[in-house]
Amino acid sequence: MGTETEYLQSIQQALKSLTTAANNCQLTYTHAVGQDVHSLCAREAVRKTLVLEAYKFLQIAQGPVDAAVTCFEQTAHLASVRALLEAGVFEVLPTDGTPRTMKEVAEKLDVDESLLARLMRHASLYGPLEETGPGSYRHTPFSLVYLRPEIRGMVRFAMDEHMPAHLKLHEYLQQTSWTAPSSSTNNPYTHAHSITGTSMFANLSAPSNKHRLDAFNDAMTVQATTAIWMIDLFPFHEVLSPSASADTVLAVDIGGGTGRAISRIRSLAGNLPGRYILQDQAHVISNLPSPSPSSYLDGIETMTHDFFTPQPVAGAQIYLIRRCLHNWPEESVIRILRNIVPAMARTNSRLLIEEIIVPESNSGIEEGWMDMIMMALGAKQRTLEEWKGVLGTAGLEVVTVYRVDGICHGLIEARVKSE
C-alpha cells in the first residue's frame, strides 16, 4: 500500500471527497425540498454520491488486504442477521429502545442463550442492533425496519433465492464457457437451485413454494414503494387528447401489477375523460381491491392479459411497460414488444418504457447490483443503445428519452417505425 505517509495522505484525500459529498447533500436537501420528481431525483442523486464516497473512504481506510478480507465479514454479518430474523429476535426486543438481556430474549424464544449471544454480538458491531452492556442489546432505527413484513420478506428473497445464484455464478459461467446467460430457464439461478428447464417465476408459483413467492412479492413491494416515479417526467396532460370521449383509450398499463402507475397517469392527465386500462395476469387482477369512489383504482378498468400474447387493446394513445422488461432475456423482450406493435396506431400511439438506463461509463451502485441480479436470471439491465437495439428489432424507434442527471432510472418514449 506504500508508506504510512502515503496511507495517511490517501485517507485525507478521501475524507475531503466525502466531506464535499456531505456538504453537497446538505445543500441540495435544503433547497430541493419538494415532492415533485425533479426535487426527489436531486436529493436521491446527491445521497447516492455520498454513499459511494463513504464506501470509497472505508476501502481506503481498510487498505487493500483488509478490504479483500471483508468478504468474510460481510457474509458473516448477513448470515447473523438472517438467523436472528428467523429466530424472531427483532420482534421480541422492545420498540421503545429499552435494552433486553440475552437471558430474557433466549427464554422468550426458547433458544440457546450462548448461540444467541454469538449472533447478536456480530449483528451489533455496526448495526443493525446496539449493544448497551455485557449481554444486553436494544433496537436502533436500523433494526426496527426489520419489523416491517415487506422488509423481512425482501431479506429472505435476497438471501434464500439470489445469494445461492451469486455464489454459484462463477461455476455456471465456467460450465458455459463464460457466455452471458440469456435464458430464463437455464441460468445461474436455475443452476444453483437445481431447476434447470424451469424459470424462477414458474418455480416460485408452484403451490409448495408459496412462502417463497410471498417473499418475492414483499421484495417487489419494497422496490415499488421506494422508487421515484419517472413517468412523472412525461407531459401526459399535453400529449393526451383533450377532445377524448369516454370511449377513447387513453392509457394501457401492461403488466401493471397493483395499478398504482395507471392511477398516477390518470391523475397526471388531469382526469381527462377516457379509458385507463390496467392489464396483468389473472392471479394479479383477482387479488386487486374492489374499485370504489374512494379507491385509487376508481376510474380504472382491469383486464386479464399475458404480455407474451398479442395486445388486445388497439389504438391506445399511451401504452406503458414499467419495470418489467429487465426481467427477461433479449429474445423475450423483443417478443413482448412485437405483441404490442400491431395494436399501436402509427399516428398517435406511444409506448413508454420506464426502466434503468445503464450509463456507458461511471455507473452507480444500484444499476450494478441490479444487473448482477438480472444476470442470475438470464436477463439484464440495458444501456440506451441496447434499448434502442431491442426496440428497433421489434419495429419501434426511440422518440424521446426522459432522464435526470445522477439517476439511473429513466423513461423511454417510442413509436412505431416510420415506413
Curated annotation (Swiss-Prot):
Q: What processes in GO biological process is this protein linked to?
A: methylation; secondary metabolite biosynthetic process
Q: Which UniProt keywords apply?
A: Methyltransferase, S-adenosyl-L-methionine, Transferase
**UniProt binding sites for S-adenosyl-L-methionine:** G255, G256, D280, D306, F307, R323
Q: Which domain of life is it from?
A: Eukaryota
Q: In which pathway does it act?
A: Secondary metabolite biosynthesis
- A single Pfam family it belongs to is Methyltransf_2
Cofactor(s) it depends on: S-adenosyl-L-methionine
Enzyme superclass (EC): transferase
- Give the active-site positions: H326
MF terms (GO), sorted A to Z: O-methyltransferase activity; protein dimerization activity
Which Enzyme Commission numbers does its entry carry? 2.1.1.-
Regarding protein family, the annotation reads: Belongs to the class I-like SAM-binding methyltransferase superfamily. Cation-independent O-methyltransferase family.
Q: What does this protein do?
A: Non-reducing polyketide synthase; part of the gene cluster that mediates the biosynthesis of the bicoumarin desertorin. The non-reducing polyketide synthase desS first catalyzes the formation of the pentaketidic 4,7-dihydroxy-5-methylcoumarin from acetyl coenzyme A and 4 malonyl coenzyme A molecules. Further O-methylation by desB leads to the formation of 7-demethylsiderin. Then, an oxidative phenol coupling catalyzed by the cytochrome P450 monooxygenase desC forms the 6,8'-dimer M-desertorin A via dimerization the monomeric precursor, 7-demethylsiderin.
In Swiss-Prot or TrEMBL terms, this protein is called O-methyltransferase desB
